Amino acid sequence: MEKFKRINREKVYDGAILEFCKDEIITPEGKKVYWDFLQHKGAAAVIPVMSDGRIIMVRQWRNAIDKYTLEIPAGGKDSIDEPTLKCAARELEEETGYKSEKIEFLQTLAPAVAYSGEKIDVYVAFDLEKTHQHLDPDEYIDLEVYTVEELIEKILSNEI
């Protein structure tokens, strides 16, 4: 299969979290097309597993979808060069008030490949040690703890 070739990328908007770009592409047939693209510096997410096997989740407001969500702790990298393991450890403590010396890589997700280059490295944290939350001024997070079975029920009922 022949590749598409990007011949130009114009940065239309440079925000704090995202860059909005317009790419000029040549298709394998030689046709020139334009695609909008969101560039993201990357993120990390972490599944905090308590000593009894339950998982700490965060409930927070998500403006883009106008509702509260139940999710694992996650956040954007401070810079494009920040290692995602460092980001995951930071987000774990900031959002949950727990830290861990045993954080293991699980997988990389690309949640919106049709229009974004965002990648989220997912980790699992064990041997949690209680500290305290360090929320950003605009973050309002409630912690909720669930068994794996309870989370599966929430996924199957479209609550997550």
Where do the protein language model's features map onto the residues?
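Acidic, metal-coordinating catalytic segment for phosphate/diphosphate chemistry
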Residues: 9-45, 51
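Nudix hydrolase/Nudix homology domain
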Residues: 1-7, 31, 68, 114-115, ...
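A generic structural signal for well-ordered coil/turn residues at beta-strand boundaries
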Residues: 14, 19-21, 42, 116-119, ...
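Active-site-adjacent beta-strand/loop module that shapes the phosphate/pyrophosphate-binding cleft
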Residues: 21-29, 112-131, 144
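Conserved Nudix-box catalytic region and its N-terminal flanking loop in Nudix hydrolases
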Residues: 35, 44-90
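A short coil-to-beta-strand element that immediately follows conserved catalytic motifs
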Residues: 5, 99-106
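Short, solvent-exposed loop/turn elements at beta->coil junctions and helix N-caps
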Residues: 9-11, 108-112
